[in-house]
Design a protein with these regions (language model features):
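N-terminal leader/targeting and accessory segments in enzymes
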Residues: 1-82, 86
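Phosphate-binding loop of NTP-binding sites
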Residues: 80-154
Length: 154
């Protein structure tokens, strides 16, 4: 997908390879959509994201002098959902989820469950030890990955 397909007012044929809300996950060709946090606004991460290869920034206020296109939107959450579904083609549409909660044994139960389910279908396991999917192991920065990473992986 190219940038001008997502934003027809931009005259850019740059390929969009992903979107993320966390500058630590930016890769070449990504759109950066920082969300406001408890202790930060998100705009303090623009330079890092652009340096790492962000091809555009989506934000809810105008910030002057960016070297990449800035798309100003009213609702960051709504725009994030739109971008995730367009870029990653709705990966969760037919997904079934199983959650494991409790004090002890969550990792064991989820690992064994994913192992057994992989014999009859395609299963993934997200937890403390990483993300296991398609015979690959992905490290995760957080026990519960950010939404963009879930879309990217699945």
């Amino acid at each position: 997908m190219i940038l001008k397909e997502l934003y027809d007012f931009l005259d850019s044929n740059k390929e969009v390879k992903g979107v993320t809300t966390d500058s630590r996950f930016i890769k070449e060709g990504y759109i950066f959509l920082p969300k406001h946090g408890k202790n930060f606004l998100g705009n303090e991460f623009f330079v890092e994201a652009i340096t790492k290869g962000a091809i555009a920034v989506v934000y809810d206020e105008y910030i002057p002098n960016l070297v990449v296109p800035l798309i100003v939107v009213d609702d960051l959450d709504k725009e994030l959902k739109r971008l995730l579904n367009l870029i990653y083609q709705k990966p969760f549409e037919n997904l079934k989820l199983i959650g494991v909660t409790g004090t002890d044994g969550k990792t064991s139960v989820s690992t064994i469950s994913a192992y057994l389910l992989n014999h009859i279908s395609k299963a993934a396991n997200i937890g403390t030890n990483g993300i296991f999917y398609n015979n690959q192991i992905y490290d995760n920065l957080f026990t519960t990955p950010i939404l963009c990473e879930n879309y990217r992986l699945f």
